[in-house]
């Protein structure tokens, strides 16, 4: 994980590469990763991981020192290694060669060089990551929080928030913040889009639904386990059972003494949530003003 200052003062900024140019490179590379992953059949979490890896690499390395498409392909190859499907190297190399040769297949000798080059860059990425490939994603948490906090709008807000989570990988949000911060940020933006109350609103009604998860002095690990094991289908289908929350006894005093944001996650900080929301929203603002950039990305 990086902090915001490390992102702002990354090596590209130190070399006076303008922020808008850095964004152009990042958005184009992430779009290439997205398009290629769809063609070769990668799941959305593997696609997101590839974007996360490529963003990580160019926080530490100059854009001008590397072939960005090769880094994108190597990121896809590394992320696809966790899939149960067959090795994706050949499919990734084919997509690279089609772009490199303007729609034509590469000769066998050239194709072999492409394979070797992408494999070499994959090893470079692993070294940069210190052989640790992150596996935290916001998607499951979006499902859990949607069910708990929006039982009446569950499917609608989950669908929008998942789309926003996919788009969040065009930003550095997932390189800076834990998955619960990103998940809750996506829910805030989704609720704004759907024009329904957000968890930032003072009068947000469903915050007490989190009582279903909490117990006194719960640890972060226990909280995540409780989120994972709760029977959400039961809660969504039988909303009348939520009335039980109102009947809980004095033992709930512990929960009531927590701050609003501690009720959402034991160590959630409001500043992190707000900063993450703004970072993701900046991407959408850039897409609205994409004529300022020399590339095309559909929302």
Residue ranges and their predicted role:
Residues 1-299:
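Non-catalytic, interaction-prone regions of core transcription and DNA-replication machinery
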